[in-house]
Swiss-Prot record:
The lineage of its organism: Bacteria, Bacillati, Bacillota, Bacilli, Bacillales. GO terms for molecular function: ATP binding; ATP hydrolysis activity; ATP-dependent DNA damage sensor activity; damaged DNA binding; zinc ion binding. It comes from Listeria monocytogenes serovar 1/2a (strain ATCC BAA-679 / EGD-e). A zinc finger (C4-type) spans 12-29. The keyword rRNA-binding does not apply. This is DNA repair protein RadA. DNA-dependent ATPase involved in processing of recombination intermediates, plays a role in repairing DNA breaks. Stimulates the branch migration of RecA-mediated strand transfer reactions, allowing the 3' invading strand to extend heteroduplex DNA faster. Binds ssDNA in the presence of ADP but not other nucleotides, has ATPase activity that is stimulated by ssDNA and various branched DNA structures, but inhibited by SSB. Does not have RecA's homology-searching function.
């Protein structure tokens, strides 16, 4: 009997767009020279990828027994917080980040911590030999009889090893190096990444194994390949930070089992990653007192308030158009706030260059940072510093009003804990909550009122 003919298609390596013919430019993402030929998987292999759990039948939701899945804590509180309290058995976690940021270091340390809970961990490296992994483990002072290391990129061999070792946790470093023999395209292609991830997901669900996979990122900072990879997994973590700075930030951008607003702080040292228990002190330890353009905001990262310094430098432009730059703060937010300052306060900023930065490499995207940004710009423009013990919390409206923000009591308590004596908050946030001792809470209704009190003439 003749074999069924397998059809050929062309897949964009940037976005996953499929076409029956080759094209120089992808019509979906407009990238050039990204179309790669690939064969459709056979029906036999494709059917295995689609299954993600034990056989089941349609059941009324009222007849399904509710179970609370016990999480496994990693002995790393910062990671536990980001994951929502620990690792959920049977889940699949994708960890992305720039090259050299510390993804492999983080997962090797996590593997060692999990073995301390009498769990068996299989670390599969597609980028290093087992001897190279051993050298890195020695540098990180990582060891344990329950930590197994395996260097392989063939997915069938990986499956056999998982069946033999029977681990509780598996680490794949990285998904772009793993390939499936039923898929003809090269490792790291859209087809390979999709099929390998689907197979690993099936293993995780059927055998109740938590799997961590490392994903490469593009030059724009997104996970390489189509967004399908991020849709398939349960949790997506991004490991951020400047390679030339010691601090690293772990964020969850997707989490089926917890919040996506949590943040974990780590410091890279010669012995690996060390957790930072109080990030507010870290972000403020190098603040220069008496400098204009410097303010502090209490920002919420999930359930944790974090104090961050916002710096602004405003100076007359030397060219026709004023220049605006922002690091860690949304550029559009900065433009909006400066427009409000011009219209509602009368600051002549149209011929001023403005450079803003959230110190410490933190990214601030919540509305409560608006007031601190506005005061820092005005402080630099007038060359008049705020008090070193002032903290600013509030959202700025287009009419110049200061709008209420959530969890004001937690923010104020965190600021008071670090020695801030005068805290500016929205007038509407004043209410029946406990104000810390020796702290003056100043409620303001407009940005003009806030500037008069923070930067008096």
């Amino acid at each position: 009997m003749a074999k069924a003919k397998r059809t050929t298609k062309f897949v964009c390596q940037a976005c996953g767009y499929e076409s029956a013919k080759w094209m120089g430019k992808c019509p979906n993402c407009n990238e050039w020279n990204q179309m790669v030929e690939a064969l459709e998987p056979s029906k036999k292999s494709r059917s295995a990828f689609n299954h993600t759990g034990e056989p089941s039948k349609a059941t009324p939701i009222t007849q399904i027994a509710s179970e609370t899945e016990k999480r496994v804590e990693t002995n790393m509180p910062e990671l536990n917080r980001v994951l929502g309290g620990g690792v959920v058995p049977g889940s699949m976690v994708l960890v992305g980040g720039d090259p050299g940021i510390g993804k492999s270091t983080l997962l090797l340390q996590v593997s060692a911590q999990l073995t301390l809970t009498n769990k068996k961990v299989l670390y599969i490296s597609g980028e290093e030999s087992i001897k190279q992994t051993k050298l890195r483990a020695e540098r990180l002072q990582v060891s344990g009889d329950n930590l197994y290391v395996y260097a392989e990129t063939n997915l069938e061999a990986v499956q056999e090893t998982i069946d033999f070792v029977k681990p509780d946790f598996v680490v794949i470093d990285s998904i772009q190096t793993v390939y499936h023999s039923d898929v003809t395209s090269a490792a790291g292609s859209v087809s390979q990444v999709r099929e390998c991830t689907a197979t690993l997901m099936r293993i995780a669900k059927m055998q109740n194994i938590a799997i961590f996979i490392v994903g490469h990122v593009t030059k724009e900072g997104a996970i390489a390949g189509p967004r399908l990879l991020e849709h398939m997994v349960d949790t997506v973590l991004y490991f951020e930070g400047e390679r030339h700075h010691a601090y690293r930030i772990l964020r969850a951008v997707k989490n089926r089992f917890g919040s996506t607003n949590e943040m974990g702080i780590f410091e890279m040292r010669d012995v690996g990653l060390v957790e930072v228990a109080n990030p507010s002190e870290v972000f403020l330890e190098e603040r220069l007192e008496g400098a204009s353009g410097s303010t502090v905001v209490a920002s919420m990262e999930g359930t944790r308030p974090v104090l961050v310094e916002i710096q602004a430098l405003v100076s007359p432009t030397m060219f026709g158009n004023a220049k605006r730059m922002a690091t860690g703060i949304d550029y559009n937010k900065v433009s909006l706030i400066m427009a409000v300052l011009e219209k509602r306060v009368g600051l002549m900023l149209q011929n001023q260059d403005a450079y803003l930065k959230a110190a410490g490499g933190v990214k601030l995207d919540e509305p409560a940072v608006d007031l601190a940004v506005a005061v820092s710009v005005a402080s630099s423009y007038r060359d008049k510093p705020t008090r070193s013990t002032d903290c600013f919390i509030g959202e700025l409206g287009l009419t110049g009003e200061i709008r209420r923000v959530a969890r004001i009591e937690q923010r104020v308590q965190e600021a008071a804990k670090l020695g801030f004596k005068r805290i500016f908050i929205p007038k509407n946030n004043e209410g029946n909550w406990k104000i810390p001792k020796d702290v003056q809470v100043v409620g303001v209704e407009t940005i003009g009122e806030a500037l008069k009190k923070a930067l008096p003439d």
